[in-house]
Amino acid sequence: MDIVSLAWAGLMVVFTFSLSLVVWGRSGL
């Protein structure tokens, strides 16, 4: 696994995590 794919994987994890936090925050949980 090279550094580019690792960086993309990390970026997707952070993006998905922050997006789910926003959704949960708006739904009142």
Curated annotation (Swiss-Prot):
It is a single-pass membrane protein. GO terms for cellular component: chloroplast thylakoid membrane; cytochrome b6f complex. It comes from the Eukaryota. It is found in: Plastid, Chloroplast thylakoid membrane. The 4 large subunits of the cytochrome b6-f complex are cytochrome b6, subunit IV (17 kDa polypeptide, PetD), cytochrome f and the Rieske protein, while the 4 small subunits are PetG, PetL, PetM and PetN. The complex functions as a dimer. The chain crosses the membrane at residues 3-23. GO terms for biological process: cytochrome complex assembly; photosynthesis. It comes from Aethionema cordifolium. InterPro entries: Cytochr_b6-f_cplx_su8_sf, Cytochrome_b6-f_cplx_su8. This is Cytochrome b6-f complex subunit 8. Keywords: Chloroplast, Electron transport, Membrane, Photosynthesis, Plastid, Thylakoid, Transmembrane, Transmembrane helix, Transport. Component of the cytochrome b6-f complex, which mediates electron transfer between photosystem II (PSII) and photosystem I (PSI), cyclic electron flow around PSI, and state transitions. The keyword Disulfide bond does not apply. HAMAP family: Cytb6_f_PetN.
